[in-house]
Amino acid sequence: LFKKNLENVGVVGASFAVYQNGKVLVNLYGGFRDRDKKNKWDQNTIVNIHSTSKGIVAMIVAKLIDENKLDLEKNVADYWPEFANCGKEGRKVKTLLSHQAGMYGWRQPIDETDFYKWDYVVDLLANQEPYHKADEKICYHPKTIGFLVGELIKRVTNKSVGKNLEELLNSPLETKCFIG
């Protein structure tokens, strides 16, 4: 099935591993790391985990809450003052984390390459009106939540999400995960 997906389904490259009690039972990998099929996929290929990163970032947030550095009931602007711009002053941390902040997109067009310009993107978000009132409805923030929560973490700790990941999770748990 793994080989079939690589050959017939259009999957460019993939890997799959099963561990039990710290022992590798299955370790499959194949295909290519790029659509041009110039770089082979190997057992050490790092992949984008996309939405899975939300759970990892949530663990960082939970750790900050546990350390009394972040409070779900406080306003986001208590940590990130610029976030209060354009009618967002009363939005709580819990509202942001639960995709109820009305900040699920950008009001001005942005380019894919802008995603690599952290300060630019979070400034855009801080200086735009929300799409709806806080807690009015849940609307998934697929493209913006990483920037919004990431900037909140950065304001609380003075460190990037990636640095927090390394210090709070990777080091103590002896894991390998990268964000940023």
Descriptions of predicted regions:
Residues 57:
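Active/ligand-binding-proximal structured segments within catalytic/core domains
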Residues 128-135:
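Cytochrome P450 catalytic-domain "roof"
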Residues 60-64, 149-153:
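Buried hydrophobic packing segments
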Residues 1-49, 71, 127:
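Short, conserved catalytic-motif segment at the N-terminal edge
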